[in-house]
Amino acid sequence: MSRHRIVRTMDYNDEYDGYDDIYGHSVEDEHCISPTDAQQWLYDRARGQQSISAFISKNKDIQEEEADEDEDEDAAFAKARRDSESFQMPQLDEIEQAKLSSCVDEVRSVVGDAVSERRIVETSMKFDYDMQKILDEILNEETNKSAKPAVNKMKAPAAPVLPKTVSKTVPTPPPKISLKEPRRGFEIPSPKVPSSPVVSGRNTPVDISAGDDISRSSATVFKVSKEQAVRNARQLYEKERADQKSHIHMIVIGHVDAGKSTLMGHLLYDTGNVSQRVMHKHEQESKKLGKQSFMYAWVLDETGEERARGITMDVGQSRIETKTKIVTLLDAPGHKDFIPNMISGATQADVALLVVDATRGEFESGFELGGQTREHAILVRSLGVNQLGVVINKLDTVGWSQDRFTEIVTKLKSFLKLAGFKDSDVSFTPCSGLTGENLTKKAQEPALTNWYSGRHLLDVIENFKIPERAIDRPLRMSVSDIYKGTGSGFCISGRVETGVLCLNDKVLVGASREQAQVKSLTMNEFPQTCVFAGDQVSVTLPALDINNVTVGCIISDPQTPIPVTTRFQARIIVFNVKVPITMGFPVLLHHQSLIEPAVVCKLTASIHKSTGEVVKKKPRCLGNNSCALVELETSRPICIERYADFKELGRVMLRVAGVTIAAGMVTKIR
């Protein structure tokens, strides 16, 4: 009851003190707008405002942008076309009509569609069908139109009005202005100025200004030795390699678990490149893990992670010798997560070996949409590989069935023909990588010899043609690996794409074009004095900033350096894409071993796949199986060549979200 007494004796006036007070906001919140803003922006009839322009009189005019030249040309072309479509020929007699028609045809053959039909007819009748006068009139008019200077429509800002001041002027001598010629990136001083033989370009900006001619990027000529400048590469090659076997690089591709590593491991063992002791060790270790069928695969899969997961993750290299060739085997990963590694290996290959699994259901899963059999074949063809050997592996799991072999061959033949391979450059070989049947000698299995009497796998490799090497071209070497050597400096591993490289040669490295001198050359762990196009070598470059060298950069000849740019035009073929390619579409650009983010900054034209004719200018998007000219822009400067100049360095691949969406050739460098 005590709490009831407290309520009865409560003074309510004390409790309501401050009840009507306002807390939590300022006095300005009671007004929706300040008086200054209201005076500037609200309409006041008393002030006599007559137009909306009074509200924005103090604001600057919005400057209009000039129209794009391409848009002006397209608009003029469209106007001329509409003029021609709406124009009707004048009514003339037969003779006059024949003269007029012949004049129009002859003028069209000279000027094309750039001039409207109305203009041609009027000019023809004006000069009484005199072709010389008609062409002079039309061509002079077109020349005058194109020669008009562009007028800048943007007005210059008005000069501020300053108050007049009266001051006593003191005569002063005119200031001396020293005019220095602007120095472009990577220019070397005159020979009169003493300079170090090794020029560091780590603080030198890269000259990536756009130009119409690619030779602008090679305008700067670096000093090289007299021997390097006058070297005859062809004579040197014949002197060094005349009595040696030809060298060829072969990449082994295919769907995951098709048996690529097992096939190559067994081939190496049968050819004597793997000792019995090493093979016995792999056999015992694989037995302990319950993976005895992987013992041949472990010859190439050397890392613990690859052996634990049972898949190849990086490109493994090995070497075999045939009667006439030295073959470098490149074992590519088959899993789709490691496609970038496969592309890096395929850029080094001359020929390819496609391994397919003949097991029921396995071939279908690898060949259907999303399988790596199809994607790998398209990738190697897009990267310039023309010769392909198809190995139908694990045919023993289906009892060496001829029907299964014929079924797989029929499906692959039609697909490979569409991918761009010639029938004469493709061969099909049945074998078993685990048992070694039909690898290095003729088949002995009766179930196979009943219907197959063709070549074994080693004979197929022996019959691959050696591609022509571009030895006479300037030096271009793509970098695939960088590591610390045993001596001073660090080593760069890569493939010599074109030209020749010798000891003590001076080279330019990457987009920075830092100059360095070759200290040592090794190939297959043997020292060399000269290496040539097609060789996989390691180069030691002392006194070089390692920050200027990255995987994917190009080593070039100082006399003809490789172009460096951030924007180029390419002719691409679009594969299956889920989202159409539009302007601003982000992609991953694959060029040799380089992986660089890029953007499709312009869709120039859609072109016909076979003829190359322009189907449509400036398309809005690119869909499946289309061919187009596009412009790509990278975030950093890269070294790249036109396909017409260097086929080896003019190919690019575009990938998005782990899927290859397009392949193309570089046609123009900005």
Swiss-Prot record:
Signal peptide: none
Tissue: Expressed in ovaries (at protein level).
Region annotation G1: where it falls in the sequence: 254-261
Function in brief: GTPase component of the Pelota-HBS1L complex, a complex that recognizes stalled ribosomes and triggers the No-Go Decay (NGD) pathway. The Pelota-HBS1L complex recognizes ribosomes stalled at the 3' end of an mRNA and engages stalled ribosomes by destabilizing mRNA in the mRNA channel. Following ribosome-binding, the Pelota-HBS1L complex promotes recruitment of pix, which drives the disassembly of stalled ribosomes, followed by degradation of damaged mRNAs as part of the NGD pathway. Together with pelo, required for transposon silencing in the ovary and testis.
Protein localization: Cytoplasm
Species whose genome carries this gene: Drosophila melanogaster (Fruit fly)
Coiled coil: none
Top EC class, one word: hydrolase
Region feature (G2): 310-314
A Gene Ontology term for the protein's cellular component: cytoplasm
Region (G3): 331-334
Homology family: Belongs to the TRAFAC class translation factor GTPase superfamily. Classic translation factor GTPase family.
Name of the featured protein: Protein HBS1
GO aspect biological process, one term: translation
Known catalytic reactions: GTP + H2O = GDP + phosphate + H(+)
Composition-biased stretches (Low complexity): 189-200
EC number(s) stated in the UniProt entry for this protein: 3.6.5.-
Subunit structure: Component of the Pelota-HBS1L complex, also named Dom34-Hbs1 complex, composed of pelo and HBS1.
Pfam families in UniProt: GTP-eEF1A_C, GTP_EFTU, GTP_EFTU_D2, HBS1_N
Keyword DNA damage: no
GO molecular function: GTP binding; GTPase activity
InterPro entries in the cross-refs: EFTu-like_2 (IPR004161), GTP-eEF1A_C (IPR054696), HBS1-like_N (IPR015033), HBS1-like_N_sf (IPR037189), P-loop_NTPase (IPR027417), T_Tr_GTP-bd_dom (IPR000795), TRAFAC_GTPase_members (IPR050100), Transl_B-barrel_sf (IPR009000)
Phenotype reported upon loss of the gene: In germlines, increases transposable elements transcription at both mRNA and protein levels. Results in male sterility: male testes are morphologically normal but no mature sperm is formed. Results in defective meiosis and spermatid individualization during spermatogenesis.
Ranges of Acidic residues composition bias in the record: 63-75
